[in-house]
Every structure is written in C-alpha cells, then in structure tokens.
Amino acid sequence: VNGEKIKVISEAFRDEVVELRHQFHKHPETAWKEVETTRKIESLLREWGFEHIRRGVRGTSCGVVADLNPGREGPSIALRADMDALAIKEENSVPYVSECEGVMHACGHDSHMAILLGAARVLSSIKDDLPGRVRLIFQPAEEGGSTSENYPGAECMIREGVLEGIDAIAGLHIWSPLETGLVAVRPGAFMSACDSWTVRIYGKGGHGAMPQDAIDPTLAATTFVNLLQTIVSREVDPKEIAILSVGKIITGSAFNIIPDSVEVTGTTRTFNPAIQDNMPVMIQRIADGVCAALRCRAELEYTRFVPPTINDEELTKQFIETAKGIIGEERVQISPLIMVSEDFSYFQEKIPGVFFFLGCGNPAKGTDNPHHSPRFNVDDDALSTGVELLAGFAAEFLAGKR
C-alpha cells in the first residue's frame, strides 16, 4: 500500500477528525458509562460500511468492535482506542469545553477515539488494497482499571473474545510531555505494572492524655510508612526499577483521641514479574514486624490491577521503520521506561502488540499541561499524524505478513 496515498487520504479527513475529537471532548463519559460515545462511534462505522459491528461488553452498552474485510484470507491486525473520561472539573477556556459538570477528557482518550476513527476512514478507503483483515477496538474503562470497584475494560473485552482470529495489535497514547508530532516507543518493557494495596493497622483506642491505657495504631502506621521504603532501597536489586508510594492515610476523629485503627493505602509500580509477585510478601512482613513490636495487628489487602506494557520486539521494530517512513527518522524516538500504567498490556499478554506515545505538547497552545490535570488539552495538529501512523502501520503489517 502506497504510504503517500495514505497521507493524502488522511489529510482529506483532517478537519473531520479534529471535529470528532472536539465533540468527544464536549461530551465526556467516565468508565463503564460511555453509552452515548459508543452510540456515536457505532453510527459512524455503519455509515462508513464497516461490517460485523458488535456493541457492548460486560453486559453494558459500552464499547464497539468492528471488522474491515472480515471474510478475507490472510493476516489480521487490531487497532485499539480507549474511550473513558475522568471525574475532573475542566478549567480550560476552549469552545469545546466539557459540558458535563465535573467530568472531562483529561488524559486524551477523546483524541484516541478521533484518531482511530480517522484511521478507519483511511483504511476503509483502501480496503480493496489490503491483503488481510483489520479489527477496530473501541475499549471502555481504561481508567476503570485503577479502582477496586471497577474492572479494566481490556481484560473484560478479552474474556468476551475480542482477540479471536487476530495476529497482532497496535495502540497509541497522546502524550503532553512530548513535543507535538514526535513519536516515542520502546521495544520490550515500556510502561510499568500497577498494583494497589491497603494495610489496616488495629490497636486500642483511648484518651490522648492517657496513652498508657491505649495501643496506638498511629505510631505503628507512621513507623510502617517509614520502613516501607527499605523495600526499594534494601530488598530490590538496584539494577531493577520499583516504586512504592503511599497515597492515603485515614485515621482518627478528634485531636485528643487515640484511634482504634489506621488505614494506609498506596501503589506499587514494577516491571519485573518476580518483584511484583514478592511485593505483597515484603509489605506484609514489614507490617507484621512493626505491629508485633508495637502491640498492634495488621491486615493487608493487595490488588494486582494492570500488568506491565511489554512491546513485542519484532513488531516494534517494524513499527519504528514504518513510522520513520511516514513522519521522518528525526521524529521517532526511543522512549525511556515509563512508570505510569496502561491496560493495553492485557492485550499484549495474549498476542504480539506495540504501543507508542504520540506527542501533543505545545507550550504556545497550552497543551503541555500534565495528564489528569484540569487544564490538560491536546494540540489538534497531532491528530493527523496519529491517523497516518495507525493506518500506515496496519497496512504495512498486513502487506509484510502476506
């Protein structure tokens, strides 16, 4: 498939892709509530002639899967975009500001959907030239994987067969720390695993002026928090990477009361599965040791949320070569390891996958604010690059596997 042809077609849909992103941005929906977003995407795909469109996952009306050339012999590739917004009140002053109070697309998923829809338009325009099949995956609840009350959308879609008959998968994330139009990717380990934990420390409540009659769980909790960092500094090989952070401590009801219990909640980030497996063992041991010394009792609740994002080596090399051909060698970078997490990793546990960052940072346009901040925004000039990369890589993959 001619790369220049893809570029020309992408350019023709440039304004439409930008408008789609603005519409998604105005009407954000949080994890497992992406009903209207799903309806809009499904309607567009039917209008553009896609077949075998399936809507909904996990008994909801959220998420869309659609196939291009479903009956064609040959290789197959899936392209994925996440859909959900965040419970954040937007502080941007743009014509397409969120119209949903307290909810905004603060991580760029509006861009991901618009880019994948743009790639869908391009690929449907050249479908007769494609020697294989393309599956589009619009996934709900990527952010949903970060809370114990929710489920990662990727994992749910896999359970319902979204990868059946698919040889490989590709996805992207818009990235404000990276200059608009640049691409960053990394073969092998790319983004960390994400786990959550809560330690509850139980003592015996009492009067703050009579500590001898109480068993102080706050003292145990503060000692526990301090000693936690010895896991990273003294138990994890210095050549490995691990993060252990405390995000929340809940205790007490008044200034003069020693509480009965303290709840400490945090996250771990790892790349090495052996270290990830050992984290709850190490946390529990420190909690038990501290509590034994200070007459308290500890309980650990440990939840493994998202595995590390591991890019397939060969597929990533192929993507890098394709990207260099589309946007130029100087605009493709090898990324450092990234400590945030992404449930695209569930797909990569099943089939070869490549995930990359697309830069959208432009200080002149105010699009260099951090992800998950109320002033996060995307430079629309990045969108057409994303369309070309997804469509171009899908076409190159199918041609190379023929």
Predicted regions: what is each one?
Residues 29, 82-84, 141-143, 175, ...:
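Active-site beta-loop-alpha junctions enriched in small/polar residues
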Residues 75-78, 133-135, 167-170, 222, ...:
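Structural motif
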Residues 219-402:
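Metal-dependent amide/peptide-bond hydrolase catalytic core
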Residues 2-105, 114-131, 135:
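Acidic/His- and Gly-rich active-site-bordering loop/insert found
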Residues 24, 66, 79, 109, ...:
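Divalent metal-coordination and catalytic microenvironments
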Residues 62, 86-87, 92-104, 110-111, ...:
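Histidine/acidic-residue-rich, glycine-tolerant segments that coordinate divalent metal ions
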Residues 78-80, 197-199, 355-360:
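Non-cysteine beta-strand/loop elements that form the S-adenosyl-L-methionine
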